Amino acid sequence: MRGHKDMSQIKAVISGVGLWTPEHSVTNDELVESYNAFAEKFNAEHVDSIADGSVEAKPLSSVEFIEKASGIKSRYVYVKEGILDPDRMTPNIPLRAEDELSDQAEISLKAAKKALTAAQKSATDVDAVIVSCAYTQRYYPAIAIEVQNALGIEGFGFDMLVACSSATFA
């Protein structure tokens, strides 16, 4: 893109792709055990409200239901701690300081480095960073800008935030 004045002469090339897969995973067995403990605790704590109809009981789940409904047997997770805690049911991801890379930028950076290696390119060969993500950890800066800065890429950065379809749009 550098040096081009006529946009018709720009040729976009994807010369490498990179993927980073988290080291942790949660199986359906683990998920069902944790969720059912959460549901049983909730139902026990709200027994009177459930009986009078003001609160709906949490149904129990099963491995078979999850696999039939989604086809998923296991899912990779960035941070496993907290996900299977029936009192929490969400990952425990500590907040980072504003001057640190966001968790999402750190993940993107790992994938970007793999893409550069696959393409046999360096950061100076890259004109644009496009990041697709379902949501962002911070309002500013954009994840693509964080990746650009971390790798020393010139050009532009763009976050494509299209919820669950982000990857398909990118």
Predicted regions span which residues?
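Secretory-pathway/luminal and periplasmic proteins that interact with or process carbohydrate-rich
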Residues: Y135-P141
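Conserved "HGTGT" condensation-loop signature of ketosynthase/thiolase-family condensing enzymes
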Residues: R2-D125, L151
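A glycine- and small-aliphatic-rich helix-loop capping segment at beta-alpha/alpha-beta transitions
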Residues: A142-I153
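Short pre-catalytic strand/loop immediately N-terminal to key active-site residues, enriched for Gly-Thr
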Residues: G155-L161
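Active-site-proximal alpha-helical scaffold in enzymes
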Residues: L161-A170
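Short glycine-rich or small-residue beta-strand-to-loop segments that form or flank ligand, phosphate
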Residues: D127-A134
